[in-house]
Curated annotation (Swiss-Prot):
Family to which this protein belongs: Belongs to the cyclin family. Cyclin T subfamily.
Gene that this sequence comes from: CYCT1-2
GO MF term set: cyclin-dependent protein serine/threonine kinase regulator activity
Superkingdom of the source species: Eukaryota
One annotated GO biological process: cell division
Protein's UniProt name: Cyclin-T1-2
SUPFAM superfamilies registered for this protein in UniProt: Cyclin-like
This protein's UniProt keywords: Cell cycle, Cell division, Cyclin
Record's compositionally biased regions (Basic and acidic residues): 314-324
Organism expressing this protein natively: Arabidopsis thaliana (Mouse-ear cress)
Residue ranges with Polar residues bias: 332-345
Lineage: Eukaryota, Viridiplantae, Streptophyta, Embryophyta, Tracheophyta
Presence of the UniProt keyword Cell cycle in the record: yes
Region annotated Disordered, chain positions: 1-20, 285-345
Transport among keywords: no
Length: 460
């Protein structure tokens, strides 16, 4: 990783022996806690790292693992397992004492072994080093550099195994999700609902839900959230979900709410633009996390691509990269969270008339919206810089806030194209906006994370 890792090496060795001495081979470590317990008792909190900073660090290593997994060409289930290992590790170890990128590299190596998709130590080290040191891509080919990284990874592997007490058994929500959809959902709803539910499961890997709930509970929450799509009428299945997954309505709602929080915490990073054509307002706006949460319409599209779920498979290894195609999700502008959308989206601005007057009014409203977004981004930036000065674990080679947001925007499974409908209150006319496209198409270093899933018609 970087020079700071050399200082961590000796500390990691002592940490590993310390953890090992406090654990026994027959000791069973509980891996499920309440959200309050996780946030209050985090080891990072004792080292002065607040919840907001820890959340940023969690997003950082999740993004790192997704990109690393794509470079190594491992399936989604292996990436998910690596993220699980990282979450469990930092449940018991502090971010201040352990380099997250080294730990993430170790977790990817272990996940490949556990999921029987092994990758060589050399490949993992080189891919990880090139990801971290973008300006020194040839460095990993030098023997002295490679040997140093190898030593760090092997030390980290001992520490991770000791911290997890060699408990590497991981279950994912994918299998119960697919089985429930095949069992209960009507044919017309299978494809769309399964796609969105699968994407929600992938996205919630960035949360601590896997440390709070059983995999089948998370699957139930993802299905419930996907069932709120305007084109799917499955709310009557709420009781069925509770019975099938042995979950209470309160737990189901809590999972749904935490998934939505994931989309709400990251603001829009691009400004919106408005054009007019023939009296129709055309809005080009990147999809924000708030839009994803309130409109409930995320997808796995990256650069216009979509991912596929193979319903013909029922085990955790049924995940595969799907062919890329244009994916469009229709949004209901009267969703139950429409009020919150007004602070972050211009898509719901009512056009008084479908002529020049309406376009002018829309531009004025958009001007105010842009000023609010810019002001909020400036405050977030200052807050972030303040957090960085409080702790020294975010060094100059780590991702800045804007880079983290760019990476998350690429990897989050949110919808990239949406048709939005605006009703005219006077003439009862409907104006269909053109496609809303994500302005951040280029990405960083042309790195894209392969999506999993989408359903083939032949699988239904």
């Amino acid at each position: 990783m970087d020079e700071a890792l050399n200082e961590n090496a000796s500390g990691s060795e002592s940490d590993a022996s310390s953890v090992a001495s406090n654990l026994h081979d027959d000791e069973i470590i509980p891996w499920f806690f309440s959200r309050e317990e996780i946030e209050r008792n985090s080891p990072s909190r004792r080292d002065g790292i607040d919840l907001k900073t820890e959340t940023r660090l969690r997003d950082s290593y999740c993004t790192f693992l997704e990109i690393l997994g794509e470079r190594l060409k491992v399936p989604q289930v292996t990436i998910a397992t690596a993220i699980f290992f990282c979450h469990r590790f930092f449940l018991r170890q502090s971010h201040a004492k352990n380099d997250r990128q080294t730990i993430a590299t170790v977790c990817m190596l272990l996940a490949g072994k556990v999921e029987e998709t092994p990758v060589t130590l050399e490949d993992v080290i080189i891919a990880s080093y090139e990801r971290i040191h973008k300006k020194d891509l040839a460095g990993a080919q030098r023997k002295e550099v490679y040997d140093q990284q190898k030593e760090l990874v092997l030390i980290g592997e001992e520490l991770v195994l000791s911290t997890l007490n060699f408990d590497l058994c991981i279950s994912h929500p994918y299998k119960p999700l697919v089985e429930a959809i095949k069992k209960y959902m009507v044919e017309d709803a299978k494809t769309q609902l399964a796609q969105f539910a699968w994407n929600f499961v992938n996205d919630c890997l960035r949360t601590t839900l896997c440390l709070q709930y059983q995999p089948h509970h998370i699957a139930a929450g993802a299905i419930l959230l996907a069932a709120e799509l305007p084109t799917v009428d499955l709310q009557s299945y709420r009781e069925v979900l509770c019975q099938e997954f042995d979950i209470t309505p309160c737990q189901l709602e809590d999972i749904r709410g935490q998934i939505l929080e994931l989309y709400e915490r990251i603001p829009t990073s691009q400004e919106s633009k408005v054009e007019s054509s023939g009296g129709v307002a055309v809005v080009h706006q990147p999809i924000s996390r708030d839009m994803a949460s309130t409109e409930k319409c995320p997808s796995s599209d990256i650069e216009g691509g979509s991912s596929q779920v193979n319903l013909s498979q029922s085990d955790d290894h049924s995940v595969h990269d799907g062919s890329r195609s244009e994916g469009i999700g229709e949004v209901n502008s009267e969703s139950e969270a429409q009020k919150n959308l007004q602070d972050h989206s211009v898509g719901n601005i009512m056009v008084e008339k479908s002529d020049d007057v309406g376009v002018v009014q829309l531009k004025k409203d958009l001007q105010l919206h842009q000023e609010e977004v810019e002001s909020k981004q400036e405050k977030d930036k200052k807050s972030f810089e303040k957090d960085i000065t409080k702790i020294d674990l975010m060094d100059e080679k780590d991702l800045t806030e804007s880079e983290v947001e760019d990476e998350i925007n690429k990897t989050m499974q949110t919808g990239r194209q949406i048709f939005m409908k605006v009703e005219d209150p006077d003439d009862n006319m409907t104006v269909e906006h053109s496609e809303i496209r994500n302005a951040n198409n280029s990405g960083v270093d042309d790195e894209l994370v392969a999506d999993t899933c989408l359903i083939n018609d032949s699988d239904l």
